[in-house]
Amino acid sequence: MAKEFSRTRRIAQQLQQELAVILQRDMKDPRIGFVTVNDVDVSRDLSYAKVFVTFYEEDLTLVEQKIAALTAAAPYVRTLVAGRMKLRVMPELRFIYDSSLVEGMRMSNLVSQVITNDKAKQKQAGREDDTPSVDEQEKDTD
């Protein structure tokens, strides 16, 4: 019977917390800037860890430069993490840009834009039909 939280998942969570603190406080590289550690995926044998990160910038060339800077600093970051976590094997860190946050924001903006356009078209048409809008239906249920 498998445990609810496997050892690799617990290590990944602790590694994520330690990496977030180290990248925010201990790294002084101006090329990296503000970085957020979204997730860490550790291999079963603890030899590798995929570190999913996001940056404040959305420009793809800047993101690639920041990933390259993190990759170059990975051995140093690994030694800092090894000093904080007591593991027999410290995973090799592989930094990967996580575009899910940017994609989520883009999708949210698209949905908002479609809703705005739909409302404008309804006003322009003069609301020829008498069906209540979504907003009116929500007010009726409150």
Curated annotation (Swiss-Prot):
Entry's localization field: Cytoplasm
Pfam families assigned: RBFA
Region entry Disordered, spans: 118-142
PROSITE patterns referenced in this protein's UniProt entry, alphabetically: RBFA
Biased composition (Basic and acidic residues): 118-130
InterPro entries the record matches: KH_dom-like_a/b, RbfA, RbfA_dom_sf, Ribosome-bd_factorA_CS
Compositionally skewed regions (Acidic residues) per UniProt: 131-142
Top-level taxon of the source organism: Bacteria
Molecular function terms from GO: ribosomal small subunit binding
Signal peptide: none
Record GO biological process: maturation of SSU-rRNA
Swiss-Prot/TrEMBL keywords: Cytoplasm, Ribosome biogenesis
Entry's Gene Ontology cellular component terms: cytosol
The protein's assembly and partners: Monomer. Binds 30S ribosomal subunits, but not 50S ribosomal subunits or 70S ribosomes.
Biological role stated in the UniProt entry: One of several proteins that assist in the late maturation steps of the functional core of the 30S ribosomal subunit. Associates with free 30S ribosomal subunits (but not with 30S subunits that are part of 70S ribosomes or polysomes). Required for efficient processing of 16S rRNA. May interact with the 5'-terminal helix region of 16S rRNA.
Family recorded in the similarity comment: Belongs to the RbfA family.
Protein name as annotated: Ribosome-binding factor A
Organism of derivation: Shewanella denitrificans (strain OS217 / ATCC BAA-1090 / DSM 15013)
